[in-house]
Structure formats: C-alpha cells, structure tokens
From Swiss-Prot:
Major subcellular site: membrane
Positions glycosylated per UniProt: N61, N95, N169
Biased composition (Low complexity): 139-167
Pfam families: PARM
Signal peptide bounds: 1-20
Naturally occurring in which organism (per UniProt): Mus musculus (Mouse)
Tagged with keyword Cell membrane: yes
Disulfide-linked positions: none
Name by which UniProt lists this protein: Prostate androgen-regulated mucin-like protein 1 homolog
The keyword Iron-sulfur is assigned to this record: no
Length: 296
C-alpha cells in the first residue's frame, strides 16, 4: 500500500510539473516537423470544411487569408470552450518530440509561435492572437512551410531557365562568328573576279591539281585488283573468247612436240650407230666406236 501511495504521488507531482511548465516557443525546424504531416482536422468545430484543405495549397491570396483569419477570430470563444474540455490531456512537455494522441493535432506547441512573414505583410491584428487551444495558428503555420517549399522550386526553375537561355546565347554566339566571315567572302571574290581576270587563271589550276589526286586512288585500286590471281583469271576469261583459248592451247602443244621431237632426233643421230649413215671417209684411224667396222 505504501508503494502504491508513493507511485500515485510521483505521478501527481509529474502532472503538476507538466501543467506548470512555461510554454517556450519552438524553433522553425520543429514547427515544420510538427505541422507538415497534418493534413486534416478532426474537431467538431463548424469550420472543419475550411480546415481540410491540403498542405500543398500554398498559393493563397491575401484576401483569402484575411477572410479566414476574421472568421476564425469570430469563432474563438466557442472553440475555446469546446477545446477547454478536451485540452488538458493534450498538454505535453516542450522538450518531448512524440506525436499527439490519435485524432488530435499538437496545438500546445504551435500556440506561441511567431507569425509568419505572410501575416506581417497582411498587417491584420487577428494574426497575433495567442491561440491556447485555438486552431487559427495551425492553419497559418500549415500554410507557411508549403510557401517556403514552393519558393526554392520557383528559384530552381528560374535558375534553370537562365542557364538554358545563357547556353542558347553562347551557342548562337559561337555559330555567328563562323558564319560572319563566310558571308563577306563571296562579295570580295566577285569583286576581284570582275576587276582582275588573272584571278580566274589562278583558280583554274586548282581542279587540275585535284584531278591527279582523284586518279591516284583509282590506280591504287587497280594495283590491288592485279595482286589477286582470281581476279586476273576473271579478266582473262572476259577478254578472250572460247575459240581464242582453244587456238592458244593448240599452239602451245605444237611447240612442245617440236621441241621434244628435235631433241630425240639429235640424240639418235649422234648415237654409236649413227656414223654408218655418213658417206665420207674418217681417215686411217678408223671408226673404233662402231663394232661393225672392220679395219682388216
């Protein structure tokens, strides 16, 4: 029993400390973290339809903000009474970063936040009302981070457009100098050709110099074609007909036969028995090479 009493006293003192702790305004980073995820409100106030607008709609006009602020301030007493009944369990420690209970946004930390730049520009006194349970600062704070997020997007788009235009201008500037000297070149040539006929004479050898250069690749191609024997045979077949090829083969065979026939005849004539066919006398020495010759 004593332990239970001590635990109850500890819980009671902790609750008193939480309730009596001063509400310190949170920095901008905590404001964005606590207000950005909130998309809709689930209170029973008559202006819930106005509060259910998404966070992304950050492009509101000044007139819309003034009317919403005036309507919210006119409904502050009723909202304060309704939330006064349900607000005690919603109070929490300033240093805690835990989310509020389900169905209720964290309004205790957003109540003493400084007004956004949009509120200062509007100059409406309703924007500086201390909302200790009211919902107008939540709406304004939910609009502030979205406007802050849209401003970098616009700056990025402007920087991209500026870079694209600068690159386009640089390319145009690079193209124009190349085209500029080409344009006056033709009038000068026409002027020189009209006044001095020698310019034509100097311009004529240019194609003459190019003509041998054009023929040189043709020669190289012909030489490469002559190196292959298959192409040579094709050229020979195309140049000679079948009759000319037959005549060439016959002449080659006849020449071969004549050469071999003459060699055989000379060999037989100069053999050991060839001297008998001769009619002249060989002298006293006789023909000792012939076995039929009888010297006796």
């Amino acid at each position: 029993m004593v332990c239970k009493v001590l635990i109850a006293l500890c819980i009671f003192t902790a609750g008193l400390r939480v309730q009596g702790s001063p509400t310190v305004p949170l920095p901008v980073s905590l404001m964005t973290k606590s207000s950005a995820p909130v998309a809709t409100w689930t209170t029973s106030a008559p202006h819930t339809a106005r509060a259910t607008t998404p966070v992304a709609s950050a492009t509101h006009n000044a007139s819309v903000l003034r009317t919403t602020a005036a309507s919210l301030t006119s409904q502050l007493p009723t909202d304060h009474r309704e939330e006064a009944v349900t607000s005690p369990p919603l109070k929490r420690d300033v240093n805690s970063t835990d989310s509020s209970p389900a169905g209720f946004p964290s309004t205790s930390s957003d109540g003493h936040l400084a007004p956004t730049p949009e509120e200062h520009s509007l100059g409406s006194p309703e924007a500086t009302v201390p909302a200790t349970g009211s919902q107008s600062p939540m709406l304004l704070s939910s609009q502030a981070p979205t406007s802050a997020t849209t401003s970098p997007a616009t700056s990025l788009s402007e920087s991209l457009s500026a870079s694209v235009t600068s690159s386009h201008n640089s390319t145009v500037a690079n193209i124009q100098p190349t085209e500029a000297p080409m344009a006056p070149a033709s009038p000068t040539e026409e002027h020189s050709s009209s006044h001095t006929p020698t310019s034509h004479v100097t311009a004529e050898p240019v194609p003459k110099e190019k003509s041998p250069q054009d023929t040189e690749p043709g020669k190289v191609i012909c030489e490469s074609e002559t190196t292959t024997p298959f192409l040579i045979m094709q050229e020979v077949e195309n140049a000679l007909s079948s009759g000319s090829i037959a005549a060439i083969t016959v002449t080659v065979i006849a020449v071969v036969l004549l050469v071999f026939g003459g060699a055989a005849y000379l060999k037989i004539r100069h053999s050991s028995y060839g001297r008998l066919l001769d009619d002249h006398d060989y002298g006293s020495w006789g023909n000792y090479n012939n076995p039929l010759y009888d010297d006796s």
